[in-house]
């Protein structure tokens, strides 16, 4: 999600370095970043932050990390975390391909990919967050029993992701081509999810593991 540039964004984030990190200095210190040692779930591409903040509030027994490379967008998530005093949520402004520089092998229990950029042009396929290059990153940081939960309104990206994950050897389950047709009570909608669902787009979802 692109927002108007805020020249003061980095200074704002630095003032809240107890919950947000804008560099790669957290390697080997992720566990110490939280108040309690608990399973860690991450969302790659947190956008405006509704999903990750609501998940953290609903599941205090889990530590959450929202990953959003756009510092201007990250401001919104920090504001929500501070205003609502969400203690089991931390935030990182890094690119997804650098996750192995942040997390140790097997350190993460679940990865959420919600409404990622579909990068529709074939020449941009390697930028899709379900491309095999990213799957290798996820495989490294996920626990052996860890899972990826993926949601998108983009049918082409969903089909591509199924093919990419299957070709990589991943096991897929709970494939849903119309999530909102019989929406689970525990489904937390992102801002994008509401937007596209209201426009009549079907929401696709799946779970996968290595």
Swiss-Prot record:
Gene3D superfamilies membership: Vaccinia Virus protein VP39 (3.40.50.150)
Binding-site positions, S-adenosyl-L-methionine: 43, 68, 95, 117
Domain of life: Bacteria
Catalyses which reaction(s): guanosine(46) in tRNA + S-adenosyl-L-methionine = N(7)-methylguanosine(46) in tRNA + S-adenosyl-L-homocysteine
Biochemical pathway: tRNA modification; N(7)-methylguanine-tRNA biosynthesis
Record keywords, A-Z: Methyltransferase, S-adenosyl-L-methionine, Transferase, tRNA processing
Active site per UniProt: 117
Functional summary from the UniProt entry: Catalyzes the formation of N(7)-methylguanine at position 46 (m7G46) in tRNA.
Family of this protein: Belongs to the class I-like SAM-binding methyltransferase superfamily. TrmB family.
Protein name, entry field: tRNA (guanine-N(7)-)-methyltransferase
């Amino acid at each position: 999600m692109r927002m108007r540039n805020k020249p003061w964004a980095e200074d704002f984030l630095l003032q809240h370095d107890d919950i947000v990190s804008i560099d790669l200095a957290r390697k080997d210190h992720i566990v110490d970043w939280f108040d309690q040692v608990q399973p860690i779930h991450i969302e790659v591409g947190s956008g405006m932050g509704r999903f990750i903040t609501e998940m953290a509030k609903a599941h205090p027994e889990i530590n959450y990390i929202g990953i959003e490379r756009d510092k201007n967008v990250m401001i919104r998530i920090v504001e929500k975390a501070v205003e609502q005093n969400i203690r089991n949520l931390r935030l990182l402004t890094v690119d997804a391909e650098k996750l192995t520089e942040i997390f140790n092998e097997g350190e993460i229990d679940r990865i959420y990919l919600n409404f990622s950029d579909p990068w529709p042009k074939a020449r941009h396929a390697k930028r899709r967050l379900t491309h095999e290059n990213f799957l290798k990153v996820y495989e490294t940081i996920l626990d052996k029993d860890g899972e990826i939960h993926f949601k998108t309104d983009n049918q082409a990206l969903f089909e591509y992701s199924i093919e990419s994950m299957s070709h990589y050897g991943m096991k897929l389950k709970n494939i849903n081509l119309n999530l909102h047709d019989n929406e689970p009570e525990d489904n937390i909608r992102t801002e994008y999810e509401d937007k596209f669902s209201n426009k009549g787009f079907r929401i696709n979802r799946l779970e996968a593991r290595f």
